[in-house]
Structures are given as C-alpha cells and as structure tokens.
Amino acid sequence: MNKHFDVIVIGGGHAGVEAALASARLNKKTALINLYKDRIAAMPCNPSVGGPAKGIVVREIDALGGEMAKAADKTALQTKLLNSSRGPGVWALRVQSDKEEYSKYMQKIVEEQINLQLIESIATDLIIENNTVTGVLLKDGEILKSKCVVLTTGTYLKSEILTGHEKFSSGPNEEPTSNGISESLKKSGVELFRFKTGTPPRIYKNSVDLSKAIKEPGTDAKLAFSFSTNEYTPIEKQELCYLIHSSSETKKIIEDNLTKSAMYSGKVESIGPRYCPSFEDKIVRFSSKETHQIFIEPESISGDAWYIQGFSTSMPTDVQLLMIRSLPGFEKAEVKTWAYAIEYDCVNPMQLNPSLEIKNINNLFTAGQINGTSGYEEAAGQGLIAGINASRKIDGLDPLILRRDEAYIGVMIDDLINKGVWEPYRLLTSRAEHRLLLRNDNAEHRLKEKGYEIGLIKQAEYNEYLKYTEEINNAIKELEEIRFTPKSELAIKLKELGQADLSHGYSGIEILKIPTVDIEVMIPYISSLQNLKNNQLQSIVIETRFAGYVKTERKTVERLVKLEKKKIPSDIDYDKVENLATEARQKLKKVKPLNIGQASRITGVNPADIQMLLFYLKNNYATEQK
C-alpha cells in the first residue's frame, strides 16, 4: 500500500466522497479512508436527496464539478418539484433515492477514479507537528503521510447510541466510533462540542396496510439535478410515497412513557436538530396538536422495508413498538430496524477559515457534520469545497471562496464561520438574503465558469454549457423581436385558454411578462423555444418576469462586494481600534475576518463597530485599503 499522499480524506460519507473525488480530479494523489467500501456514501437516515435550499445545493455541486447530482439522478425512485406554487426563489427539486444503488454508484465512481486509492480501515489519530497536520495513524499502526488532510467523519467522532435508558459507544448502524481524533484536536486547541441527531424505525413492507394512506406521487415533468442528465423516469414508473397521520393513541403512549425517552430522561446532554426533532419532542413542543404528519417512503427498489419519515425517537424498543402499532395501517407492523438517537463530537466552525481549513492547524480541513451541519447535501457541498481548497493549497493557489450572492454553499459556509452553530445547522431558503439570485434554474450560470476555471468541469461539458447559454440568449432575442397581433394564432389560443386577451400588437417578451401566460403555450409559435430544457424555459420566464427585481438585487450585491474588497490585514490588533464594543472586539479576535464584508456578518458586530474599524484601517493601513 502506498504510504505517501497529497491529500488524505478521513470518512467516506457524502462530504468525504466529494472531497476525495475533487482532490483526485485535480491531479492530487488522494487516499479515502473508510471502514467498508460498500458503505461509501451511505444513507444512514433519510433515503432522499434535495428539498428546499438543499436541492439547489445539489445543482451547485454539479455546476462546480461534483458528483452528487449525477448519483441522485441515476438512482432516483421518485422526482418531485417542491414549492412550485410559490415564487421561483424557493423552488426546489427532491428525489426519493434508492439508497442501495446510490451507494453502489458512488463506490464504482470512487474505485474507477484515477489518482484515488480507497483504503478500508479506521483512522485512529492525526499526526500533528508544529501546528501542522502531516499524516494519519490507522488502527493497525500504519502511518500514512500527506500534505493535507480533510476530516469528514460525520457522526462517528466519539459517538454514542441512545435508546431509552441504554447508552453505549458506537457509530451509526453499530459501526465502530473514533475517539483518538477528538483527543488530537483538543490537544491542538480546537474547541469541540456535542450534538445529537436521530433516525426513525424501518418497518417491513409486508406487515403494513397502506390502502387508506394518502398517495404522494412525484412530479410529471422532465426534472433532474445534473446539467448532463438526459434520461428521465416517466411518472408512471416512479415509486409512490405515502402520507399518514399519527393518532391520539400515539400521543398518549408518548406522554405516558416520556421519562423512558433518552431525550427526557437526562441521558441526552447534547443539542439536537431544531428542524428535525424526535417525535416525542414534537408531542412536548406542540402539545395542543393531537396528530402529526408522517411520510412513508421506500428505501430501495429491492428493499423490504419502509422508512418512517418524521418518526425518529429515542424511546426503548418496547415503547417504540406501541408507538408504531398505534399508527393507522400499522396495527400489525413488524420492525426491521429500531430507531435510535446518536451523540457525537463537532468542531466549533468559528475556528475555520472560509476555505474550511482549521485556523490553528495548518493543512487540516473539515467538512460535513463535524462542522455542526445536518444533511447529506450540506455535507457534500462542504466536502467539495474542502477537497478543492486542499488541492489548491498544495498548488499555492488562492482558495475557492463562494460569496453569499453566488451560492447557497457560500451562504452556509459564511454562516458557519461567522455566526457559529448552537444546534445542528440546516440550510434554509430564509438564510439567503439574495435567494432571487440563488435559484433552482440558474446554478450553471452562477458557477459553471468557476468549475471550469478550477479544472473540475471538462472542456466538452463547458462547451455544452456555452451552447445552453447561447440557446437561452437566442430565445430571448427572438421573443423581443417577434410580434403577435390580436388575430394571430397565439393570441387566439391564449384567449381560448383564458390566459390573456391581446387588445393590440405585443412582442413575444411582452406576452411572456403577463403572469397568467404559460410559456408552454408559446412554444409552437417561437422556434427558438422548441427543444429547450425545462431549466432553460424556467430561466427565460424568471429573468423576463422578475427582471426589475433581479436588477435591483444585483445592484445591492455590487455595493456589498465592495465591502468584500476592503481587506483586513492579518496583523491587525483589535485592542488598538478605539470605541469598539467589547463583544465586537472579542468576536473579531476569534473569527479573524479577512475583509470588512465578512466582519459585518459576524454575530455581535454592529454597524457602529464597522464604522470604527473602517476609520482605524483608513488611518493605519491606508495603502492596503486603496
């Protein structure tokens, strides 16, 4: 086995896979350490990819040259466009994934990737010399040397499983946990804290009756995450999900047994996810509600179990069985896998640079749940950035840092390093102040150029993107030039459908600006709209109808970007900046922002503090500020 690498990635989950692939594709000799090769990119919790904000992250990963979007498209059981009745800033794609096939797909990609070696082992310790990571110690005593290390350990750092009053050391699915890395980080002055998450039970399909459940089909449209996907599963071949509601009996069972839950017995000392609470937590927090939604989802086309979305719990197994059998259609349910909660160590992400490198340990990057986030998509996005930046650091290049107006990935990383996390962080559209610019349809326009410049987007795909963009521009040009009279076929059709009544001549673009007009009706009459992808049509409609809002938003961004260009020297002494609030001074010292824009987003730093900082920089670092 080779013992010298450019980059070592510890952990083969969604963050680790993206980090390792990015590094290897950028011509770095890369090792990916994971205990079992058949657990690469496993889905230990929900068998799905995407959702609000998260689905846009998957598109961003694809635009930068990552793999998650392709894997999700290839292994989708159902595809659904969410929030389609609302504004385009919150549209999002979600797929129900075949978790077995997803993992197999990623395993194949990893094993076939040039420059990438998959090592089946456990990393038990980091080798850190003079505040610089130089390698990794494996469980068999083998030492691997490297220039950079990316930690993507998920929920495996000093993890403990909790069910009822039982608590024991283990990773998800009873896999080994890792304690040594936590101790290494602590010795190097890295602040750690404990978070909690959980997973629901899995129920044998043949033991439940879903005849009275509400069917939840996918969306009947050609939808995909990846720019390169051209094959779509027709709606009639997609798998169904189902919706049921818990009963009043379910609520009573939980209320009667609440002290048996690990959450409410004092066993859990860590903080759980606000946006994915345990079922007993829902009963306590929303005590006035008698019932709660529960989604029944397939895990695999070849699988024999349902995933019970929204029903995670840390109750003992005897109480879990009572809870499950109180659900409509689950009176005779048989459990394949019991629910459990899991506690694990995280790094305080305010100790990270925007590149995701730990500030006080050179060449050590972290990504995924170790940074306090939740979700496969958030992890994959961070993993991609960490892998890219580890590679770029070796080459002596500036890191890739995405701004908040460029990507949801940028919003997430900016939130992590400047605001910190006090509970598992979930990406939401409400976290993005520029969400009209960060849409489901325009990830390619925002990031494909960057992916190409970095080297992850190959020439052939880049040429396809240029063609894609040209087709949109040609269509908009034709819409601006072509005119339709009230007696034209299109005008008559629109009137018949009740979408518009043209009283005089209109250009195609003026017609498209009418909110009630469906662009699909216009396609037969506009040659350049024909054969366009769904995303291209979406972009044309949104850019046309929201042009004024988009223009205003871009002007706002231009002003903010100017603040990003006002650099803060690394040797600044914040104690010498007069009239700074005490909290602001403490936070600035801790975060060490690179520029005024970043400083302005730190929790506890107010506009008055920024003015004092600008005044100090002008008087003491005038040359650097020009």
Curated annotation (Swiss-Prot):
Task: Name the positions where FAD binds.
Answer: 11-16
Q: Which GO terms describe its cellular component?
A: cytosol
- One Pfam family named in its UniProt record: SAM_GIDA_C
Please list the residues that bind NAD(+).
272-286
Which compartment or compartments is the protein found in?
Cytoplasm
Disulfide bond sites:
none
The answer to whether keyword Chaperone applies is no
A GO biological process held by the record = tRNA wobble uridine modification
Binding partners and assembly: Homodimer. Heterotetramer of two MnmE and two MnmG subunits.
Summarize the protein's role: NAD-binding protein involved in the addition of a carboxymethylaminomethyl (cmnm) group at the wobble position (U34) of certain tRNAs, forming tRNA-cmnm(5)s(2)U34.
Regarding protein family, the annotation reads: Belongs to the MnmG family.
Q: What is this protein called?
A: tRNA uridine 5-carboxymethylaminomethyl modification enzyme MnmG
Q: Upper lineage ranks?
A: Bacteria, Bacillati, Mycoplasmatota, Mollicutes, Entomoplasmatales
Per the record, the gene is mnmG
